[in-house]
Amino acid sequence: MHTLIERLEKVTNSKELEEARLNALGKKGVFADKFNQLKNLNGEEKNAFAKEIHHYKQAFEKAFEWKKKAILELELEERLKKEKIDVSLFNAIKTSSSHPLNYTKNKIIEFFTPLGYKLEIGSLVEDDFHNFSALNLPPYHPARDMQDTFYFKDHKLLRTHTSPVQIHTMQEQTPPIKMICLGETFRRDYDLTHTPMFHQIEGLVVDQKGNIRFTHLKGVIEDFLHYFFGGVQLRWRSSFFPFTEPSAEVDISCVFCKQEGCRVCSHTGWLEVLGCGMVNNAVFEAIGYENVSGFAFGMGIERLAMLTCQINDLRSFFETDLRVLESF
């Protein structure tokens, strides 16, 4: 039985400690076997042997408790060493990058401001006149059906486009005017390509009649799109907007399939990016301008960002999913 304590002294972990305990104190252990041998003894020999077994059993249990305490302390120390956090260890600080929408906004502004365009910021809450009527969209005009608008009391509403900023600018300033405006706009729509809040940027140039022609508009738009998208092909299409006449929409060759045809471009090889045109005389009359001409253009910032970042779901810009945002 001396070997039991000697084996116990060589134990180095909890697993070995449990094995030593079962070997000595288990139902089939050494001490259980010794107690079973007592039935074969008689008288003083039995008493002496029983006393000896109890002595060694108590000695083993005492040694076991001491060893158990030592093993637990040792294992705790080793575990704390592994889990220890070295606060002095250098940890590289992650630097943030621009949100795709902010990057797109800044890139657009960087193109137009050196050309003399002044950045104008307008109110998000507008009235019916500045948002609709002054833009050749009088009450009951069928084009208003396209606008799912958030209305307030007293004919107030959340602007559905940034065009009201152009109206305010023309009311407050006199030609020549070169301006861009950008910001949030609101419409009641929510799906893969629409959100209730989205961003637009528009531009306006106004000068004395005859000084601004469609060729000027065409040159500005083509320079901008080549700056923004690189070597893409452009396609001009006639269109209709109540506030411009003539009006056009501009497409670029698909940046995803290189005009081979894909789901994004509906297998046409072209992607619509903006609308533009010469300012309708009805808009100038609503402001009180005479003998002037000008052009205007507008585009969705999310649309441009989706094309440059190759994102299919517009809602990804607003859901703060870092797995998505950190991929840009």
Curated annotation (Swiss-Prot):
One GO term describing the cellular component: cytoplasm
Reaction equation(s) it catalyzes: tRNA(Phe) + L-phenylalanine + ATP = L-phenylalanyl-tRNA(Phe) + AMP + diphosphate + H(+)
Keyword Mitochondrion: no
Tagged with keyword rRNA-binding: no
GO function term, MF aspect, one: ATP binding
GO biological process per UniProt: phenylalanyl-tRNA aminoacylation
CDD domains in UniProt: PheRS_alpha_core
Keywords for this protein: Aminoacyl-tRNA synthetase, ATP-binding, Cytoplasm, Ligase, Magnesium, Metal-binding, Nucleotide-binding, Protein biosynthesis
Leader sequence residues: none
Coiled-coil annotated residue ranges, if any: none
UniProt subcellular location: Cytoplasm
Enzyme class: ligase
Record text on subunit structure and interactions: Tetramer of two alpha and two beta subunits.
NCBIfam families (UniProt xref): pheS
Family that this chain belongs to: Belongs to the class-II aminoacyl-tRNA synthetase family. Phe-tRNA synthetase alpha subunit type 1 subfamily.
Name under which the protein is recorded: Phenylalanine--tRNA ligase alpha subunit
